[in-house]
Amino acid sequence: TGLAALKWNGLDVSFIRKVEKGREGWLFLKEEVAGRNELLQSLGIRPYRDIERKLWNLLIVQRAAWAKTQGIQYVMVIVPNKASIYPEFLPARYHSADSSRALPDPPGVPIVNLTADLIRQKSIGQLYHKNDTHWNELGAFIGYQSLMRALPPPFQEAPLPLDSMQVQWVTEPGGDLARLLLMDSVLMEKAARVSVRHPQARCEISCDAPFGPWMSPKHFRNPHARLPKVFFDHDSFFKSVAPFVAEHFQETIFSWIWQGFHQDMIEATHPALVVDEFVERSLIGDRPRNVP
């Protein structure tokens, strides 16, 4: 809108308090809901309260213990906030604190934190959208590579190399942060499009349904894969990871839900591995929960 553009261009501030205007056209999410501030978390300014850490650790340990009783390996995966990867584009008034970032540390549970690999790979290209909270498809590909290297045996496997992908950069409308500002048609950006050149995995169930929260899980099959069935409980970040990881498993099930754990679906499909993925900011400011 005109008012949004005026505040953006003339006053150098964003239209709403949820969005922080960074340097060089970058946008960042601030407080998504009360108590969940991504910037304070990524900068280490907002450490965990003891009760929060205990609740999250208990929940994750319970999920892993239940999976073990079913003969299923459980792995927790953490996708970093954009501000954790690109703090250099935050406004100059933001500074990191000495305290460590707020993340659970459940004892005895395998955790794959993708942050370090994404930071190391920033030189290959932009990994997150400037005006969206999410990584772009190049960032998703780097996250996929990191995950496949870090999974516990016998699920670990060498990831596909980048040169086996088709990579294009396309101009597209602004993402979720630009939409919050009512400026998605103004704040255009180039975004990576990454696809497997010769895919072997095929979607077989819910292929035409929208890929979104609370939708029917999507099932992929690859008869040429070595690894057994896997179930991904994930959020919006793994929508773009799905085509890559599906290449490695005989059957891959993707169920999109915020913080949730589809125990009934997991029990019914009985995978060998459950990957429970969380974006970093989802691990604070809310009571963790399971979905029956």
Summary of predicted features, one role per range:
Residues 1-292:
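Extracellular glycan-modifying ectodomains
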